Amino acid sequence: MAKKIIAKIKLQLEAGKATPAPPVGPALGQHGVNIMDFCKKFNAVTADKPGMVFPAVITVYADRSFTFELKTPPASFLILKAAGIKKGSGEPNKVKVGKITKAQVEEIAKIKMPDLNARTLEAAMKIIEGTARNMGVEVVD
């Protein structure tokens, strides 16, 4: 028989830097999960990708065991990294804060493809371009 799921927790954590401090500790502690065990496993899996941010979906079972699944880094994080900027524009329609090329958009779309609800690479690229536009990042040829 399958284990009974009591919670699904979503966190965005930097690779190799999960610690029992907030936000990890309180989120997992209230469900009785061994926080250090999660931190060690997460850090081991993401150790080879320093500086990246990963969304993790942690499934907590009734016996206090857990499994976690890593998603691809957020599109906004990948766009900021590609454009070489710290944060997006406060007024994206008026103030442009950076530029990325179509090739960079395609690269980001390839990375994000498993998590996007797009069937083709072109559709995924349009999603990424829209995200970039909403952040005040210009897409150039």
Curated annotation (Swiss-Prot):
Post-translational modification remark: One or more lysine residues are methylated.
Keywords: Methylation, Ribonucleoprotein, Ribosomal protein, RNA-binding, rRNA-binding
Keyword ATP-binding recorded: no
KW Ribosomal protein (keyword) present: yes
GO function term, MF aspect, one: large ribosomal subunit rRNA binding
GO cellular component: cytosolic large ribosomal subunit
Domain of life the protein comes from: Bacteria
Pfam families in the cross-refs: Ribosomal_L11 (PF00298), Ribosomal_L11_N (PF03946)
GO biological process: translation
Oligomeric and partner information: Part of the ribosomal stalk of the 50S ribosomal subunit. Interacts with L10 and the large rRNA to form the base of the stalk. L10 forms an elongated spine to which L12 dimers bind in a sequential fashion forming a multimeric L10(L12)X complex.
Described purpose of this protein according to its UniProt entry: Forms part of the ribosomal stalk which helps the ribosome interact with GTP-bound translation factors.
Annotated family: Belongs to the universal ribosomal protein uL11 family.
NCBIfam families assigned: L11_bact
Record protein name field: Large ribosomal subunit protein uL11
Organism: Kosmotoga olearia (strain ATCC BAA-1733 / DSM 21960 / TBF 19.5.1)
